[in-house]
């Protein structure tokens, strides 16, 4: 397969079958492309079939193997049926990436109990449903690797208390499952916690938030935000044999931003407003290599401008 330029060995996931929930857009789409470029048979699943179909077609045009299947992760019965369908078609399910989820910006004082419960149900309960389905449908007898996409929330999550609570629950659940399921043929369960990432998810932000985000990317040790490819690469590492002795961890992929709070002089004086000296990893092909005109990131123009800037220093 040509097209997506992964930093990993091209046949790393040959003969592996990987389910990526929320795989039609944003970070999930990038994870699917990276895994397919490494030889995996990828199944992407979400509620909206049109987005899944478009991504699956992209991957197949590049020579990869990808199926699109619809799922509501809040339905535990449907989650198990999805896993069973994958095993029936492909004979196995060796890896699961729980990327599906969602939230909205709201201060806790304005958040209804229904809104809180809805986000917790989708993110926390939905992730458990998929983990349990993978265990019951295949991994309990054969082993496997699971990566849950969460968020860096150790210091709270202002304006998103619902997703902060849910993601914290997933992190604890991940550690618990790593202990309980490790004896079942070596199942490994880990988390990846992205920092601020240049992705299509930023389309959901109000314009005022996009304006602030687009002008403050330098206020961290890395001097920039992350790329979808950097999250995808972290997931690939944790799924791969290179992480065979890693289980129960929450890997923060945030350029050190979660460690950089509390400067007495303020972040404005601690970091370099001229930009980043940390090269970015961007796997999307460019120029003459982008023969299928793959769209890199479907984000607001100001966010796309940031990605263009990061590409100039990419690895």
Explain the meaning of each model-derived region.
Residues 17, 22-25:
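Conserved glycine-rich cofactor-binding loop
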Residues 147-169, 174-183, 196-197, 257:
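Catalytic loop of short-chain dehydrogenase/reductase
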Residues 136, 179-183, 244:
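Alpha-helical segment proximal to the catalytic Tyr-Lys
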